[in-house]
Design a protein with these regions (language model features):
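Hydrophobic beta-strand scaffold residues
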Residues: 33, 57, 91, 114-115, ...
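Glycine-rich phosphate/diphosphate-binding loop of Rossmann-like nucleotide-binding domains
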Residues: 6-42, 152-240, 287
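Glycine/serine-rich phosphate-binding loop and adjoining beta1-alpha1 elements at the start
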Residues: 2, 8, 77-169, 298-300
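An N-terminal-biased, well-structured beta-alpha scaffold segment characteristic
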Residues: 2-110
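Rossmann-like adenosine-cofactor binding region
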Residues: 209-292
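Short glycine-/small-residue-rich Rossmann-like dinucleotide-binding loops
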Residues: 69, 75-76, 95-96, 221, ...
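Adenosine-phosphate binding glycine-rich loop
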Residues: 118-159, 269, 274-370
Length: 370
């Protein structure tokens, strides 16, 4: 199979979908890899590294799309890429369709096969291709929250961990999954007063067992959230429903009840966000303020630490990419239940329920396209 890896062109997206080591593994399996020139530079990989691994370099994104049977990316195609995608071309990347109707309609119209990293799901309901970036984003959410809590960035002026004789900041984490767990580890390790809210009592018991004493757990309901946001210094939105729009758990009317200078970090922004006031931002302009509350809603947070993120992502995605290349997408999906759940849009059909529900589109069972 001919594999193409374009350079990411989303704002400040410095990750690349394939490392030189990953390219070498694909070539070793008998396939051809074409990298767009300088695609790996943001992650510290030179074109020469890819050539030494057996890949070929093409100067433009147009040439990569034109020659490839499968495109491997990090983030969803943006509007300028829509016209480059061919009928029957496989796209393997993060799509987050449920938060982007124009993207969904474009992919339905071009006849492509869209395999979304974020909905590849194991039998135990874990999401192996989302976990690495959730780990990165969860840890980064506390770094960013602590930074914007500083007065020079408009925050309340509180040191996250406090000092002897002065209490630490209060951190509220909504959602106890991978993002929430990693955020709690970071905030707890820095000495903050942390509360994790989740709907699953089983998950809360687990978190209560593994977290230090300064990390507490609480059942998620509107009353508890409404009360907790009033005194929080940093609020992390970490709620996920795989492939579907995130629920809006912090509503517009809660914002004025918060302290001026409170920092809200919505890690769920890729799926529409779990704050009603969320609007996607970029690394160039990461924050906005509503009622004196700072909102950080960058949709590609791990893009700011591309070396770590690229290595972590390729470790997870490469085995699946090789399966698709070796067997073709149909056979690979038929033989791998987890990969089959990654199919979202196939040749003009929506085959993932969450995407269909998000836009009121007809849903077809994935078996009809295999």
């Amino acid at each position: 199979m001919i594999i193409g890896v374009p350079k990411e062109i989303k704002n400040n997206e410095n990750r690349v979908a394939l490392t030189p080591a990953g390219a070498a593994e694909i070539v070793k399996n008998g396939h051809t890899v074409y990298m767009q020139a300088t695609a790996g530079m943001g992650s510290g990989f030179a074109d020469e590294d890819y050539m030494n691994a057996g890949a070929s370099i093409l100067p433009t994104i147009e040439e990569v799309y034109a020659i490839a049977e499968m495109i491997i990316k990090v983030k969803e195609p943006i509007e300028s890429e829509y016209k480059l995608i061919k009928d029957g071309q496989i796209l393997f990347t993060y799509f987050h369709f449920a938060s982007g109707e124009p993207l969904t309609m474009a992919m339905l119209g071009n006849g492509s096969i869209c395999l979304a990293y974020e909905t590849v799901e194991m039998a135990d309901r874990s999401l192996p291709l989302l976990i690495p970036m959730s780990e990165v984003a969860g840890r980064m959410s506390i770094q960013e929250g602590a930074k914007y809590l500083e007065k020079t960035f408009g925050g309340y002026g509180v040191l996250l961990g406090g000092v002897p004789g002065v209490p630490p900041a209060k951190v509220l984490i909504i959602g106890g999954g991978i993002v929430g767990t990693e955020a709690a580890k970071m905030a707890g390790g820095l000495g903050a007063d942390v509360t994790i809210i989740d709907v699953s009592l089983k998950r809360l018991r687990y978190l209560d067992d593994i977290m230090p004493a300064n990390v507490k757990t609480m059942m998620s309901n509107e009353y508890n959230i409404r009360e907790m946001v009033r005194n929080a210094d940093v609020i992390i939105g970490a709620v996920l429903i795989p492939g579907a729009v995130a629920p809006k758990l912090i509503t517009r009317d809660m914002i004025p009840t918060m302290k001026p200078g409170t920092v809200m970090v919505d890690v769920a922004v890729d799926q529409g966000g779990c704050f009603e006031t969320t609007v996607p931002t970029t690394h160039d302009h990461p924050t906005f303020v509503i009622d004196h509350v700072i909102h950080y809603c960058v949709a590609n947070m791990p893009g700011a630490v591309p070396r770590t993120s690229t290595l972590a992502l390729t470790n997870a995605t490469l085995p699946y990419a090789i399966q698709i290349a070796n067997k073709g997408w149909k056979k690979a999906c038929n033989e791998n239940d987890a990969l089959r759940k990654g199919l979202n849009v196939v040749k003009g059909k929506v085959v993932y329920q969450g995407v269909a529900d998000a836009f009121g589109l007809p849903y077809q069972d994935v078996e009809t396209v295999l």
